[in-house]
Amino acid sequence: MRTSGRAVIIDASSSGASGDKFLGALIDLGGSPKSLDKVARVVEDNLPGASHVHVKATRVERGEISAQLIEVRSEEKVSKRKASDLQSSAVKCAKELDLSEWGTAFVKSVLDTLSSAESRVHGHSVKEVELHELGSADTLVDIVGTAYLADELELSGARWWCGPVGVGTGVTEFSGRTYPNPAPAVAEILRSHKFPMKTSNIQFELTTPTGAAIAVNLADGKAGEIPIITPHKIGYGAGAKNLDEIANILRLTIGELSGTDHAHDEVVVLETNLDDVSGEVIGRAVERLMEAGARDVSITPVFMKKNRPGQLISVISDKTKSEHLAELLME
């Protein structure tokens, strides 16, 4: 549990969230572009089918605000990957980059969020779901890069908050089809995490699935109400497109929590009885629940009907993750 008085506020209310905007804002806060070069090399080495992965950082203006634009380029020999394959590559990247315990858990949780949303939208199991654009090298660079830069900036011990996430209207295209904004995966991520959403009249994909997944996992249940902080540093990440209506940026503000501001965590306890289940199955269930963001999982021996021995599995979860964890618990 993070107890530092240091806080990071994510402002994605006007122009949404995307992986490249998060990377840009972290670079603007002082992260090294060379760190992203390192992340790109590690992703290329550990993601089968990806080659020539490069990252370019450029200072640009969005609505007369100076911001960092991050562009990820790669060549792909495959058009889609299973979510489980991307997760496996991500774990290897985290290990090679020596991510902190928080960073490694964050990477896993973001990918779990993406695969869970895609599986619900398309009606496939998490194990069977295949990622198209979301399975590319740039998705992995966005997620692993965010964790790596947060570690570098010593933000892994900070408490993160996020206001409402801005989403556009109109339509967006991917996988050769047209979908309404926000994209179905974005809507599902925000719904399942009970995250506030702010709809604008801008006909553009302001928030991407990767951006939404990063935001909900960084905020870790702390969404909507922003605490009182003393700001110390501000970073701006630029979106790829320069929009006429708004400054297409994401803002990260680092500060200290006010001494009069007391943050309270709300948790949910999920429990179910298990009967005639092997220890191996229970062990794997505990592992999956922890990887998906449970705060704690415990197993208690109990007597069931007719004095049959069984187990009570108890899961402590943040409110925003409780629905997803309940679904895993029932699988």
Give a label for each model feature.
Residues 2-8:
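Extreme N-terminal starter segment of soluble prokaryotic enzymes
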Residues 9-26, 131-154:
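Conserved phosphate/anionic-ligand binding catalytic regions in large, soluble enzymes, centered on
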Residues 13-14, 43-44, 135-137, 164-173, ...:
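Acidic, glycine-rich active-site loops and adjacent beta-strand->loop/helix elements
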Residues 19, 128-135, 139, 211, ...:
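Long, contiguous binding/interaction regions
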Residues 28-122, 183, 190-197, 202-212, ...:
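Glycine-rich nucleotide/cofactor/substrate-binding loop typically near the N-terminus or early
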Residues 33-35, 155-261, 273:
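Mobile "lid/hinge" segments at catalytic clefts and subdomain interfaces of large enzymes
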Residues 49-57, 101-107, 121-130, 157-162, ...:
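Flexible, glycine/charged-enriched surface loops at secondary-structure junctions
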Residues 264-276:
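Short glycine-/aliphatic-rich beta-strand segments at the starts of folded cytosolic domains
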